[in-house]
Amino acid sequence: MFVHPLNVAISDSQNKYQYVVCKHTISVFAGEKLVGYWVDTDQRDSHNSYKKLKSNAGDAKPKGSQGIGAPAVYSYIRNLRLTSDEGKLIACVDSDKSVVIFKIDTSAEDPEKFLQVMKRQQFPKRPNALALADEDTTIIVADKFGDVYKLKIDEEPIRKIDDQSEPILGHVSMLTDVAVAKDANNKSYIITTDRDEHIKISHYPQTFIVDKWLFGHKEFVSSVDLPKWQTKFLFSAGGDKEIFAWNWQSGELLSQYSFEDAVKPFINDQHLAPARFQNEENNVIEYAVASIKSCGQQPYVAFFVEATPVLFILHCNTETGELSLAQQVEFKHNVVSISSNGKSEYLVTFDNRDENAEQLIAFLTYSGDSNKPFSVDENLNKLNSSWISTFKQKDELLADADSVYPLYNIASLKKHGEHFS
């Protein structure tokens, strides 16, 4: 048995507290010390609760598992987000299709009181992404089936959201990411992306008014990012073999960076297309960018291709938007998630499904060296041993090779012929 990989990791702006998701739990560390711990007690029993699908004969049958030997249903916690005052934490929870808002009590001595549930709002469909608006008083929630809702943080939960609150905008396909931006005149916009190669920019709160579309992607868009160091820029990535840099305010595509050659040495059998989409030689490869994140204070943007052990870091010209490869950082294990904070640090989590794995997370700090702008912080890296020791004391966080939650779901967003018929 080993500690399950960390699905998500973020920190506050100064990296005093680290918030990490492991399966259906959220742990909060202050360096080596576990100061907060929350377990989703509403999680479903994945071994006994199966979704039903209708067979051609009309009989109900259990839905197949997501992987060999894996349970059919997984209670993910995803999309951790801190409010700008860092007093609240927001998470999307799969077990009951909800958004959970926590009040953070840094004075709490009991780890179970550090994160206090303020509100738990269920949605008709699984929340897929979230952003903050209205000076962090409103959460913008995008769901799996293409609808976007707004949720007031301080209001009571709505019993039946479909009856009392309608979507503020929508797409015809699965939403993959959402962001909120302001232009030079302080007007707000919602930026949404989907499985159909679309980036849509809508006025907010008048979301029925579409400001523009950003056209250029030929495959699905999985991730967008708005850098703090140039507020008119937007970065996007997904199923294409390029990273896109936009001026979202004018709608101009500023540049594209092709990573096809750079990632080629890291492509392996995990990137083979599903059997039903293979050719006779069985060599059709499919891969996608799982996440793209700009650096907090410096003009860099990092991304990784799903199921690879390398992080690519691009430099961005803040005047022209031109992207160029500044560095690639290789690790022992595949990257699972990345995030950045206000100290120009990246937090990187790994697929450490190895009995002897000693690294759950790495911290990359900005060095200022133009030839190697980021380096692994060895002092922070020492936190791995203390975190692993803490997690090993909690049985719910241990796993074996057959019980790891599916970590690689992005490439499956790619559309094939059956999706267009």
UniProtKB/Swiss-Prot annotation:
Pathway: tRNA modification; N(7)-methylguanine-tRNA biosynthesis. WD repeats lie at residues 72-112, 170-212, 216-258. Keywords: Nucleus, Repeat, tRNA processing, WD repeat. It is found in: Nucleus. One of its GO terms (biological process) is tRNA (guanine-N7)-methylation. SMART domains: WD40 (SM00320). This is tRNA (guanine-N(7)-)-methyltransferase non-catalytic subunit TRM82. The lineage of its organism: Eukaryota, Fungi, Dikarya, Ascomycota, Saccharomycotina.
